[in-house]
Regions:
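Short, amphipathic C-terminal "tail helix"
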Residues: 101-150
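Glycine-rich phosphate/pyrophosphate-binding beta-alpha loops
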Residues: 1, 6-21, 115-121
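Buried hydrophobic packing segments
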Residues: 5, 9, 24-29, 134
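Short acidic alpha-helix initiation/capping motifs at coil-to-helix transition points
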Residues: 1, 80-88, 108-114
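Gly/Pro-rich interdomain helix-loop hinge
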Residues: 18-101, 144
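A general structural motif at alpha-helix termini
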Residues: 9, 61, 96, 135-138
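Short coil/turn segments at secondary-structure boundaries
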Residues: 1-5, 70, 93-96, 122-129, ...
């Protein structure tokens, strides 16, 4: 999903692909770490494990927590800190995208991200409205922790 959203965001607003991926990443991790109501079309596992995989990554890079949820939040914060240390924008707005233009194009942007070939590889099958919400969160503010996208 992150890659799908970055494809469309970068193409629409001329944001370099790596930067678009970085800005969206904290929100997609938060989204994917929540138990889905629907898996992807062809999941590679029978039970939801994305949150546990994120927790393993957090432990591997030295920011694991006492619970899976705490580990996921620590991972998201570590991604955000890295963006700050590298002096990268931490929101779509900081990438120079005009707010009115962004929200005028948001519905079509989310629909195109939903249709992107990479979306089917995501551990959660997103609704277009969920993609819009992730984009909206990523537009306005740096990641604040414990945000959820339903």
């Amino acid at each position: 999903l992150n890659h799908s959203m970055a494809h469309k965001l970068g193409g629409e607003f001329h944001i370099p692909h790596g930067r678009a991926n970085a800005v969206i990443l904290p929100y997609v991790i938060a989204y994917n770490a929540q138990k889905p109501t629907k898996f992807t079309a062809f999941p590679k596992y029978e039970t939801f494990i994305a949150d546990k995989k994120y927790a393993k990554i957090a432990a591997f890079i030295g920011c694991g927590g006492h619970t899976t949820e705490e580990s996921v939040q620590n991972l998201i914060k570590a991604v955000y800190r890295l963006e700050q240390e590298l002096d990268c924008p931490t929101s779509i707005k900081e990438c120079g995208v005009d707010e009115k233009l962004f929200f005028d194009r948001l519905p079509a942007l989310a629909e195109r991200a939903h249709e992107d070939q990479c979306t089917t590889a995501n551990p959660r099958y997103p609704l277009i409205s969920e993609i819009e919400e992730i984009y909206t969160q990523a537009y306005f503010a740096p990641y604040q922790g414990s945000q959820s996208v339903h």
